[in-house]
């Protein structure tokens, strides 16, 4: 399955594209601070 981009809905960080993490409680992908 395709990864979720910035602000995409997610259930876990595994749903998000590289350098993004799922923000728990908000359930969207956001930058995880890595390059």
Swiss-Prot record:
SUPFAM superfamilies: omega toxin-like
Pfam families in UniProt: Toxin_12 (PF07740)
Protein name per its UniProtKB record: Tau/kappa-theraphotoxin-Pc1a
More info: Negative results: does not have effect on TRPV2, TRPV3, TRPV4, TRPA1, TRPM8, Kv1.2/KCNA2 and Kv4.2/KCND2.
UniProt GO cellular component terms: extracellular region
GO molecular function, one term: ion channel inhibitor activity
Matching InterPro entries: Huwentoxin-1
Recorded superkingdom: Eukaryota
Family: Belongs to the neurotoxin 10 (Hwtx-1) family. 62 (Vatx) subfamily.
Disulfide bonds: 3-17, 10-22, 16-29
Domain remarks: The presence of a 'disulfide through disulfide knot' structurally defines this protein as a knottin.
Major site of localization recorded for this protein: secreted
General function of this protein: Selectively activates mammalian TRPV1, the capsaicin receptor, a non-selective cation channel expressed by sensory neurons of the pain pathway. Is less potent than VaTx2 and VaTx3. Interacts with distinct regions of the channel than capsaicin, since it only acts on the extracellular face of the channel, and capsaicin binds to the cytosolic side. Also activates avian TRPV1, which is insensitive to capsaicin. Significantly inhibits potassium channels Kv2.1/KCNB1.
Organism expressing this protein natively: Psalmopoeus cambridgei (Trinidad chevron tarantula)
Keywords linked to the UniProt accession: Amidation, Disulfide bond, Ion channel impairing toxin, Knottin, Neurotoxin, Potassium channel impairing toxin, Secreted, Toxin, Voltage-gated potassium channel impairing toxin
In-chain residues carrying the UniProt-annotated modification Phenylalanine amide: 35
Keyword RNA-binding part of the UniProt annotation: no
Location in the cell: Secreted
Annotated tissue distribution: Expressed by the venom gland.
């Amino acid at each position: 399955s395709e990864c979720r981009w910035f602000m995409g809905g997610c259930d876990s960080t595994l749903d998000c594209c590289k350098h993004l993490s799922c923000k728990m409680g908000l359930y969207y992908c956001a930058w995880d601070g890595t390059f």
